[in-house]
Amino acid sequence: MDLFSHLNWYSGDFMNEDGEPIKSIPSGKLILVSDTLESEGSFLIHYFLQSIFKATTSTNSSTNNNNSNNSGGVGGGACLLGLNQSLYNYFNVGRKLGYNLTTEYNKGNFTFINGLSTPYKWIIEQRLQQLEDQGIDEEPQLDSISQGFNPFPTIHLIDNKNITSSSSSSSYSNSNNKNKNNNELKDILYKIYNEFINDHKKRVMNNNNNSKTLFIIDGLNLLESHYSTNPSGSNMDILNFLQYCHNYIKENSTTCSMIILYHSDCDEDSKFFNLLQYESDLTINITGLKSGYSKDIDGQLNFIQKDEKNNTFTRVNPIHYQALDNSIRFFSMGSRIQ
């Protein structure tokens, strides 16, 4: 069973010429993935990456073979904001699932935004100071361990210097900022927005509007929790940022989508989570099994789909999942003995 064909069948918007649901990520959608401490949802991030890279490979193969009957969806790339895991982890899991992030980067299919700090920068600065004290002009190459895992160029969202941006000249900015933390958050969100937009435009230009871009935020809680003491209300800044992203996705509904991972049990106040659900076109809630532990099934995916025309929400039939070392399997309810 395929996750996306299950969702596309219910929406009815993404069908091939034979009337079958396309096995690809829905276009023009803001998708919220909600998990908990007991049912962690990072496996879906890796599944999304696997799906879009395999769709790209399948599309390229079909083009080379002049095969017009491809039902695997349109290929594309991903722009991943890593706030939850290191690039090393994404890379290793990708190898197990059958794709190589370095290869995808070289093809122009993958961009990584490092939302975490740069822990190895102090080593380089200390080494430069030592070389200067010794009167050595040329810097010897650091070993790979000291440099950190960096198989290809990445974008650093945060470094050890103060973040500066020209956000005052953008319609996305607010000139009446009084709080330093609020200014910093706005600058970070502004930079994320720009990186997403630039990555999408670059991919569209290089592929003649035939390539999709998947924006991924893994996960949103770090931005929320880091600025939770902000008296001006950082949650509204994040929601405004998502609304800007959502509007851009709607304007380019055939070539981009966004996935957001959010840990719904990290905050006692559920208002922010409810607002996230209201903004999203589709919410995927990951939960454990009501019947308890099962060796064949890890948990359940519940879906809430938004109907923009009627401004209503509909529950889609849930499915079960099993996360293995080198694959992720999905099952219809009742198709496997628990």
UniProtKB/Swiss-Prot annotation:
Signal peptide: none annotated. The keyword Signal does not apply. Coiled coil: none annotated. It holds the Pfam family ELP6. One of its GO terms (biological process) is positive regulation of cell migration. Pathway: tRNA modification; 5-methoxycarbonylmethyl-2-thiouridine-tRNA biosynthesis. The keyword Lyase does not apply. Disulfide bonds: none annotated. GO terms for cellular component: elongator holoenzyme complex. Keywords: tRNA processing. Belongs to the ELP6 family. Component of the elongator complex which is required for multiple tRNA modifications, including mcm5U (5-methoxycarbonylmethyl uridine), mcm5s2U (5-methoxycarbonylmethyl-2-thiouridine), and ncm5U (5-carbamoylmethyl uridine). The elongator complex catalyzes formation of carboxymethyluridine in the wobble base at position 34 in tRNAs. Component of the elongator complex. This is Elongator complex protein 6. The lineage of its organism: Eukaryota, Amoebozoa, Evosea, Eumycetozoa, Dictyostelia.
